[in-house]
Every structure is written in structure tokens, then in C-alpha cells.
């Protein structure tokens, strides 16, 4: 199994995340895509990886520029590297630099199926703040036409997992489109799921990372049910009163991942997580995660001194069956 991981932040944080994968997902080989925008020299990253004795990683020599909403090209670069070096029968898991695993068993869970993603229909009138820019994206419209008028489908990127052969096919389709021009939404959360759905790929489950974003959206949608009739222009994400309300709620921090949430997922506390399994975007419902199918969290601050990061590191240390330095690099037979 492979993990595609685009990074751009501090080398010491990157190395710590690699140790997290080694502890909780030792079957995976992590393919790092280092952004061309990264503000550190490569020798500094290599030194940090060497110091932490990370043997579960390959650094992709291809470096594309990345920015918010422009991470798709980084994952596709990693898919291309895997295509040149690995078997088409492998699985490729997609992650971000601010998620972390909190319990073991990911590989065993993924071996039960083929592709793990959300099925989030994106239609006009959706509460999702990025629905409108996604539906108006000329590149996505072109891709959907080439796929026979495919509907637009979204999925959380973190913790999603696809058969390598499927991602190779999707990468070929996307190569004909312009993904360099900013589009005002995270393309990686829409293009892959849309193409996979259009190609008829079997869905075996949902992503295995629990994101604080879904906690925020659930509460924000409920507030909008009462506020939209008062402020007018319901469903228009850029309407100033709506944006101001959203900003105030974000700043409150009510949705942040805490140790309590980490413990719930680490214990697989299904009853305490059940109410978050399904979410409505206002005009459709979709499944966020599967019971017993959560193994990590997002967002974890990209700071090595973050108390939450330190707490998860202690969980990883307690989980490890031996000294971290003895963890071996996965071979292609494991992948």
C-alpha cells in the first residue's frame, strides 16, 4: 500500500508525521511530494528524516508548486511516480500534512474492499461553500462531458483510498484538462471522486480520517436553517452576512479536534461517533464515515510543540511493538 502525502511545512513536522505512519500504518510506503513553494532546502528535510530514522518514505523528485485548492497536481505527481515503480494492483491512500493516525488497523480495514471515498452529490443549492465554484469550473465541466455527462461528486481527500489502476486511469483523463488555473475550491475533493463514480468504480467504504471540517459544517448548516430566512439570499456562500457569521463561528474554535475526539477514535467508540456518520448539505444526505472505520483525525496543528500532536505521539509510542528505529521500510511485496 502507498500513501500519497504532499508537504510544504517544517521538516521536523514532516518527519514526525512519517513516524506516525510507521507506528499506525507500517504496511504503507509514503511517497512525499515536496511543494516547489516549500520554504526549506531539501537537505534540511533529508536530515530531519534521517534523524528520526524514517524508513517508510520515498521523496518524489518531481516538485510542482502547490497552494490552497491546488493540491491535485501534487497527488497526481505521486500517482505518476507510483505508476513508474509499483504494481497496478496496489492501493493508494491520500493524506494531507495536517492529519494524523491515532489507532492501528488501517491496512486490515482497507484489505476488505477496493475503493474508499465519500459519495457527496454536488448540486445547485448545496450548503457546501465550494459547490458553486465547482459547478462553474470549466475544466470540471469539460471532464464531465467527456465522461458522458457525469454528475459532480465530492469526497474528503484525507483518508480516501483508491485502487492504483483506477487512479492511473483517472490521471490520464485529468491530463487533458487545465488544473493549473486557480478555481476557488479544492479540486482534489471533487475531480477524483467524480471520475471514479463515472467510471463505475466499486465503493467499499468511506475515508478513514475524521475531519473537524464536518463538525463545523454540521453546526453551520443547522444555524443557516434559521438565519437564512432572516438575512435573505439563502444558499449564496459569498453573501457578506453569511460570510461574517461563518468567520465568527470559525474563530470560536468549537469544532477543533481535541484529545477527547482523539480518544473516541482511538477507542473506536462507535456510539459516541454515530451521530456524525451522515450529514445533509441541504439538498442531499451523504455518509461521512463508516462505523468502526475511523483511524485518524484532521486537523492537527503543523507545529512540533502542539499539545495535540504530542498526545498523539504518545499514543503511537504506546502502540509500537518495538523500538521505532527497528521499523523496516515496506517492500514492494508488502505493497
Regions found by a protein language model. Name each.
Residues 1-335:
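ER/Golgi luminal nucleotide-sugar-dependent glycosyltransferases, focusing on the catalytic module
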